Amino acid sequence: MVHRMMPVVAEAAGLPFKHEPVVLRRSRPQVRDYVIHKFDEDLPPADLNGLQSALRLFGLIPDSLELRPTMIDLLTEQIAGYYDPDSNALYIPADIEPFQLRVVVSHELVHALQDQYVRLDSIITQRHVNDRRSAAQAILEGQATVAQIPVLMPEQKPDTLPLGWFWKQRTVMAAQQAQMKEFASAPLWLREGLIFPYLGGADFNVWFRRKYFGRSILDSMPRSTEQILHPERYATHDEPTELAFEGRAGDVKWEDGLGEFETRLLFQQHLGNEAEAITLATGWDGDRYQVLGANADVLVWYTVWDDAAAASRFAAGLQRAWAKRRTVGRSDIKQLTVSGRPVVRLVYAPAGWSGWSSIPTIKLSGGGE
């Protein structure tokens, strides 16, 4: 099957295979063991605790949710096969249904092809650059989603689909996955985060193939989910502004950024309106947060915006969103100007936090309109 699919996948992806990957069968317990191994490798205990604290402080996951078992159960439920860069092999569950086999192999075969041109491990294991990593995952999963279509439906030409078509299938995909126990009970951040790389990434790939016919997206990958959501920003080389915290390194439990897509999810989670969330996150140009404190109970989040209007709109929305979530500490949302750029700062911490008088500051570099 793999040998027959390879020419079609190669043509759809616009890249020839350098060699044929191996296909191996695995039992469900072996698949789960692989998920656990990869999860623990990607998020060692200190990183896991830091990320979990951040997500709780943002209100993206409940305080009662333990991230590790939740994600392991969810990923185990979702995985119908996988490509492992370490062994250059496709792994297929031994109990996979025949009708699923072509779908899984065609998709994972694209990942095997991608790995022959870029080091997948170096892309998907980037640390403390969440938004850039999310954008890269969207390219990889989106390309695989688009390239597998000619294998499964030769009469369908992905390049003829209207732009945005894949994202419009999100409700259908979510409804199908909602029949799965772990997915149905997962927080919005997890559910949407699983779907976005496939559908949002597929839409970007279709746009790229039309705009830059004959070029490989793997040669110049987007650096932010903003560029995935707004491809014209990629075309105009609108790179995100880099934010760097100054001082307090010894007190930091975790540091990263949300990006435009997860900023959308933050508003969608707390305000319950997707259209409004999209509006409030539009104009994002960069962000960075730190989790501080002995108990990892302090959040300092800076966002930089394309213009003052976008910053004001975001700040007002954040005030409403934060008022709607259950908080036990003190919060402070301020509009600032840093290096001539409009910035919004959120601080959420216990009222007695000693750092209220010396809140960490940031410096900016790159980006901008």
Predicted regions span which residues?
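Extracytoplasmic/secreted envelope proteins and their assembly/folding machinery
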Residues: V2-M6, A10, V103-H107, E141, ...
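Pan-zinc metallopeptidase signature
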Residues: A178-Y302
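C-terminal soluble interaction/assembly domains
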Residues: D285-E369
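Acidic helix-start/capping segments at beta-turn-to-alpha-helix junctions
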Residues: K18-K38, R127-D131, P162-T171, P222-E226
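Post-HExxH zinc-binding segment in Zn-dependent metallohydrolases
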Residues: M5, D115-D121, T125-M173
